[in-house]
């Protein structure tokens, strides 16, 4: 096998509802998830070595510890599910601690590649178990179909296309997921009803992210960013993705999204920002 390129796309939470706590003290969540064209590039090739090699480069490659791909390889080796060793180079274009799931999507993308190329042969149950062992969002990285995460981590996939332009802006801070969940006291009563209509713009506009309030209390700049983007012309809705710290503004057309990006960069010069589109 020659060197291959895998594109690992960023995920966005169009909604995130906290329903309560499980007996294990983890939160019960439901979420509508989509993907944008922003992606990490993963180069992978077999090597004749004793150990795998995992390296990072790019604008967001510094200070990566306990990366998800190394965890995946360690699990596959331990279970004797992979015979060869691989060199994997990741071009990191997705910021860390951004709510965009960069690391989780990386592991899911690599596992999906191994399975499709018959490097790893495992059952659906084994896929779920391995993904959950690495992280709660890794299963979402296995493919990039729009998804609804239901209680007990059940995931429903849809072929529906959303077709929205997005402006993503992230301050220099990275949110502490643990602290934000710990401060989440208000739980949603209404559960998501599975329907293709749930991905329509009017339905998405009325959705919410229950983690916004505790995140905004911890990091007031996030509230400021959302307020700013909510006032730009032709924006349909603005929402934090995941536990932050990226705020996402959604548009039907490219031109107002471009204008919003210009305004955001003018007013928040030192923040990371980008224009993208849902897949």
Model-inferred region functions:
Residues 111-148:
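Contiguous, small/hydrophobic- and glycine-enriched helical/loop subdomains that border
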Residues 90-116, 136, 237-251:
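Glycine/serine-rich anion-binding loops at beta->alpha junctions
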């Amino acid at each position: 096998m020659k060197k291959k390129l895998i594109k690992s796309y960023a995920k966005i939470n169009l909604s995130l509802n906290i329903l309560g706590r499980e007996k294990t003290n983890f939160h019960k969540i439901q979420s509508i998830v989509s993907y944008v064209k922003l992606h990490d590039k993963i180069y992978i090739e077999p090597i004749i070595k004793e150990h795998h090699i995992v390296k990072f480069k790019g604008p967001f490659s510094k200070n990566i510890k306990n990366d998800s791909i190394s965890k995946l390889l360690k699990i596959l080796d331990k279970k004797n599910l992979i015979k060869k060793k691989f060199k994997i180079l990741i071009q990191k274009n997705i910021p860390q601690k951004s709510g965009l799931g960069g690391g989780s999507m990386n592991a899911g993308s690599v596992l999906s590649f191994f399975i499709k190329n018959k490097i790893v042969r495992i059952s659906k149950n084994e896929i779920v178990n391995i993904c959950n062992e690495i992280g709660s969002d890794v299963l979402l990285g296995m493919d990039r179909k729009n998804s609804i995460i239901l209680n007990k981590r059940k995931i429903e996939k849809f072929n529906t296309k959303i077709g929205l332009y997005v402006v993503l802006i992230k301050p220099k801070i990275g949110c502490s997921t643990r602290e934000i969940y710990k401060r989440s006291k208000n739980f949603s009563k209404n559960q998501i009803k599975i329907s293709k209509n749930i991905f329509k713009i009017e339905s998405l506009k009325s959705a919410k992210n229950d983690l916004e309030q505790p995140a905004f209390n911890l990091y007031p700049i996030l509230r400021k960013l959302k307020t700013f983007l909510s006032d730009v012309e032709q924006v349909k809705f603005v929402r934090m993705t995941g536990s932050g710290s990226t705020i996402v503004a959604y548009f039907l057309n490219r031109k107002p999204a471009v204008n919003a990006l210009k305004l955001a960069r003018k007013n928040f010069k030192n923040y990371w920002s980008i224009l993208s589109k849902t897949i």
